[in-house]
Design a protein with these regions (language model features):
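N-terminal secretory/membrane-targeting segments
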Residues: 1-101, 121-141, 173-182, 299, ...
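Solvent-exposed soluble domains appended to multi-pass membrane proteins
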Residues: 88-101, 105-108, 113-482
Length: 482
């Protein structure tokens, strides 16, 4: 009887494991036509029923610990980092920095410059103001973990300093946010800043209304707070109207009080075939309403950037504006063939998964993940251009220019950037300027170990609420009990 019980338990365990593995590897779309809408999970529940919808979405909610993860390992990594990081160098570099009263960060929807991957021949320049902006500005490209969609992954990387490298197909806001999260928001609020989020669309998209509460924003201005008469293109709030709302919000704050606003725009969102939108820019030698509309939207976006910068040039309070794109646009394959002249994979799914483009090196592939970014101030700051960074580093990098206090995690990220200047799910840029895939046989072992340690810290902050090393992620070292 004992033997039979053991065999029964083994069989039950094997069946459970087999069912779990089959579930986790099941393609619900291919097998059953069930599409998991992580942008709006409630839509999946409504469309397929609560049971089927939840089952389809739930597979994305499991994140396993990285290799070697433990509370002691996190403590050891944090302790080593605090001993070895170049904290004193950072403080010396920032000694003469102006501390901005206002920090405005804008993630510009589908903002991409095709000149980084090819030579688009357009009837006129689509980024003339940005090209002319050369004083008190740092410009370059920031590497993201997504293309054509997945906006919330890029904003998560910027706000938290964590990377979506381990879960490029998942969205932390939707899958993993169950408790308070440390971020740029908490770092600035601990230093007296008011923190406002803005997005001219539904607050529930990507579960932002919940995510922003866990990130500790004081207020969230969504589409409901925009006027019905606000300028729209293709039914979406224009960047001009969006930035006017930023100015209005700034003007309503207490003069001199520290102010942080994080904005996610909507104007340039796909698709680009609206028959009521008048395109002003044409692609020479390429007849495409989609490409013409996209580049025309970029030009309108550039004009709105000009408005915002020129406004804050006249403001007395020291102000920093950070802008970056969330991902390249979802635009037709034929145009890409025209721009780069090389074959692309057949399915959009392979792009998102990061599968290798045919005939493209890893360095060329990464260019499709590199969106524009700039950091501008209305006070004197050393200008730089052609900077390569990744979005997980960007907020720490911006903070390092302000003279504000940094968390140990900020300092860790700045130190990691010295070793690995840019990284995403596909690969990384080494300190010697060489690009590697994570599974390349010649990828430096030291860099792979740095990345493993980074994953341990991220897992601790994002998932391990019970054993989270709160002091490493805050300037105050106080534990958040939420």
């Amino acid at each position: 009887k004992t033997r039979n019980k053991i065999l029964l338990r083994v069989a039950a365990a094997a069946l459970t494991l087999g069912t779990y593995l089959a579930y986790m590897n099941l393609n619900w779309n291919a097998e059953f036509g069930v599409i998991s809408d992580l942008w709006n999970p409630a839509k999946t529940y409504r469309q397929y029923g609560t049971t089927v919808g939840f089952t389809a979405v739930a597979k994305y909610m499991r994140l396993t610990p990285p290799d070697g993860y433990s509370k002691d390992e996190v403590t050891a990594i944090a302790d080593t980092s605090e001993k070895e990081t170049k904290t004193e160098d950072l403080r010396k570099d920032n000694a003469d920095s102006v501390t901005p009263v206002n920090i405005i960060a804008i993630m510009n929807e589908s903002w991409f410059d095709y000149r980084s991957v090819g030579d688009p021949q357009t009837s006129e320049s689509y980024m003339p103001f940005l090209d002319s902006l050369t004083e008190n500005v740092i410009k370059g490209h920031t590497l993201t973990c997504t293309k054509g969609g997945g906006t919330a992954k890029t904003e998560y990387e910027f706000l938290t300093g964590n990377s979506c490298k381990r879960f490029p197909g998942m969205v932390p806001y939707v899958s993993y946010f169950t408790h308070s999260q440390y971020s740029l928001v908490t770092t600035l609020k601990d230093q007296g800043y008011q923190a406002i989020a803005m997005h001219p669309n539904k607050a529930t998209n990507w579960k932002r209304s919940t995510a922003y509460r866990f990130l500790d924003f004081d207020d969230f201005i969504s589409i409901d707070q925009f006027s019905d008469t606000a300028k729209r293109y293709r039914g979406m709030i224009s960047d001009q109207a969006n930035y006017e709302k930023i100015v209005e919000t700034y003007e309503n704050k207490e003069p001199g009080s520290p102010f942080f606003l994080f904005d996610v725009t909507m104007q340039n969102h796909s698709g680009y075939t609206n028959r009521y939108f008048q395109a002003d820019i044409n692609c020479n030698g390429y007849d495409s309403d989609e490409a013409d509309q996209y580049f025309s939207l970029l030009k309108l976006s550039d004009e709105a950037i000009s408005y915002l910068i020129r406004y804050f040039q006249q403001v007395d309070e020291p102000t920093m504006i950070i802008m970056f794109g969330d991902h390249w646009p979802a635009i037709e394959d034929d145009f890409l063939l025209k721009v780069i002249g090389k074959e692309l994979p057949d399915a959009f799914e392979t792009w998102i998964a990061g599968d290798a483009y045919q005939n493209l090196s890893v360095e060329d592939q990464e260019k499709f993940y590199g969106t524009p970014f700039f950091i501008w101030t209305n006070y004197s700051m050393k200008s730089e251009s052609n900077v390569w960074i990744s979005t997980n580093y960007l907020s720490s990098y911006a903070l390092s220019l302000t003279g504000l206090e940094l968390t140990p995690y900020n300092e860790y990220l700045l130190d990691l950037r010295e070793k690995m200047p840019a990284l995403n799910h596909l690969g990384f840029l080494a300190s010697d300027g060489t690009w590697y895939r994570w599974n390349d046989s010649d990828a430096p072992e030291e860099d792979l170990e740095y990345e493993r340690q980074y994953e341990c810290l991220q897992y601790n902050e994002l998932i391990d609420k019970k054993d989270r090393d709160d002091s490493f992620f805050t300037i105050s070292g106080e534990k958040d009990e939420e």
